Amino acid sequence: MSFKYFVTNDINIPQYTLTCLLYSIVMIQFKKLINAKALYQEPDRIWVAKGMTFFAVDYSGKRISCVFNVGGMKDRLLGCHRLSSQLLRVGLHHLLPLKNGNILVTAKRRTYLYDKDGNVLNVWTGYQGNKPGHQGVCVTPEGTIFFAEYLLNPNRDHDIHLWRSIDNGMTFNVVKTWEEGDIRHLHFVKWDKYEHCLWLGTGDYGDNGSENRLYRSADSGETWELVGQYSQDWRAIGICFTEDALLWGTDAGSCSDTVHFVRMDRKTRKIEIIQDFEGPCHGCASFAGGRAFFSTGVEGGENEKDRYSRMKEYHDGRCENVWKLEKDCWPLIV
């Protein structure tokens, strides 16, 4: 179990999901809106998924769009129950409104492109893995889409690819490849509105933590600067942005290293460990004004303090717990 967060590229307002429940947050007060999974938030609506369908609701939870159906009957049946959907990774995982008005959604091993009327324009299956990490897909202000491959790859015997689309999701091409044995997988790719660049993270282990890296690209993915590497402190599942720093929690849930909350100064590129977390950081989201939220999960790792998943708010240089829930009875699912 973990809290997961999603944030738009432009307005920096997070959504919060706990299993299949959607909540809104105002001054750290929670209100249940609808039984659904939050995928993307806009100023006047929240895009949510229920099984293999998605639609938009307003801030009272009322549906304000048509219902989009994804995939075949088998997936729709498996996606109706939480246990089967989690075990088999059935369901919808990402949603991106595109610059031309179309909508990109990811499901298990398939990425769909819809127009506003619910017509399927394209189905892409050329990538490895079931799905990207929860911050593994992004779109830039110019409309370029990036898609980061995430697969288990325990033997490091696969090349790993970063994909890019410059035609609103109709075609994708490899823009960068890590050769087999170099890394395990890609964790995230995110647009930074402050530096007008992309950041990308990899994991998980390697000699002296060599697979844990942070990259930066200022030319739409053509070239990538290696900013940091080595140790579990560079192992991030996602990052948050402030005007003067990058923030992340480490994803060191299945190893002995302490899970840290890390700040990287934009000017010096030096990282500072701010505090310890109780479990691996699985999600994060940025607010306007420098506020950010982070979540921890339960994986059964030796460095976890307890069986609680937590939501934390970052302000005044530190993270404080604002909500926690105990791990449920279901098996651990990474």
Residue ranges and their predicted role:
Residues 32-41, 76-80, 85-98, 129-138, ...:
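Repeated scaffold domains used in trafficking and secretory/extracellular systems
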Residues 43-44, 100-101, 142-143, 195-196, ...:
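Short coil/turn segments that connect the beta-strands within blades of beta-propeller domains
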Residues 50-51, 106-108, 147-151, 201-204, ...:
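Recurrent small/Gly-Pro-centered beta-turn motifs in extracellular repeat architectures
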Residues 56-58, 165-166, 217-218, 312-316:
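Conserved Ser/Thr-centered positions that define the repeating blades of beta-propeller domains
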Residues 64-71, 121-126, 173-177, 225-231, ...:
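Beta-propeller fold detector
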Residues 105-106, 153-159, 204-211, 253-258, ...:
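Short, solvent-exposed loop/turn segments at conserved positions within beta-propeller repeat blades
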Residues 118-140, 148, 174-178:
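Asp-box/WD-like beta-propeller blade repeats and closely related beta-sheet repeat scaffolds
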Residues 245-259, 274-332:
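Loop/turn-rich, solvent-exposed surfaces of beta-rich toroidal or solenoidal domains
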